[in-house]
Curated annotation (Swiss-Prot):
One GO term describing the cellular component: cytosolic large ribosomal subunit
Quaternary data: Part of the 50S ribosomal subunit.
Stated role: This protein binds to the 23S rRNA, and is important in its secondary structure. It is located near the subunit interface in the base of the L7/L12 stalk, and near the tRNA binding site of the peptidyltransferase center.
Gene: rplF
Protein name stated in the entry: Large ribosomal subunit protein uL6
Length: 177
């Protein structure tokens, strides 16, 4: 059995988990998420804890049990606490502004870059050089943050660009004559 799947997922108060034949639905204060259930994994709910077991002894079923456990755990944490990614803009004149579900970036191009946030994702700018992406779906939050960063990734000589707040950019040494 997968080591990840051995630990059950605790369901906190205020979170409702329903398991149908092929769908797992999680509802909480942060929203509602659903995940397709894999046929190789048996999910059981006992006393507020979800346990995951492979249906057979195949390697694929063993791997999927750990994957399903982590996906459901991310859903439970997402609807109860939520996920967030923090990005910072480094460079002279680099600015970000959020209005509603739109993000406008002025990052040294001849034109402004605009992003439309998908449903369930909120974006805020605490300062003009910081972007905060929040949501219940961990994958969607990470994907949106990666798409924003990909517009202008940090360059290796001065470090200018959009980076994650905890990212360390290795600065290269310039060419010497």
């Amino acid at each position: 059995m997968s080591r990840v799947a051995k630990t059950p997922v605790a369901i906190p108060a205020g979170v409702d988990v329903s398991i149908k034949d092929d769908q797992i639905n999680v509802k909480g204060t942060g929203g509602a998420l659903s995940q397709a259930q894999n046929a190789l994994v048996k999910i059981s709910n006992n006393e507020g804890k979800l346990s995951f077991e492979p249906v057979n002894d195949s390697r694929e079923a063993n791997a999927m049990s750990g994957t399903m456990r982590q996906l459901v755990n991310n859903m439970v944490v997402g609807v109860s606490k939520g996920f967030e990614k923090k990005l910072s803009l480094v460079g002279v004149g680099f600015k970000a502004s959020a209005s509603g579900s739109k993000l406008n970036l002025a990052i040294g191009f001849s034109h402004p870059v605009n992003f439309e946030m998908p449903a369930g994702i909120t974006v805020t700018t605490p300062t003009p050089t910081e972007i905060l992406v929040k949501g219940a779906d961990r994958q969607a939050v990470g994907q949106m943050a990666a798409e924003i960063r990909a517009v202008r990734p940090p360059e290796p000589y001065k470090g200018k660009g959009i980076r994650y707040s905890d990212e360390k950019v290795v600065i290269k040494e310039t060419k010497k004559k």
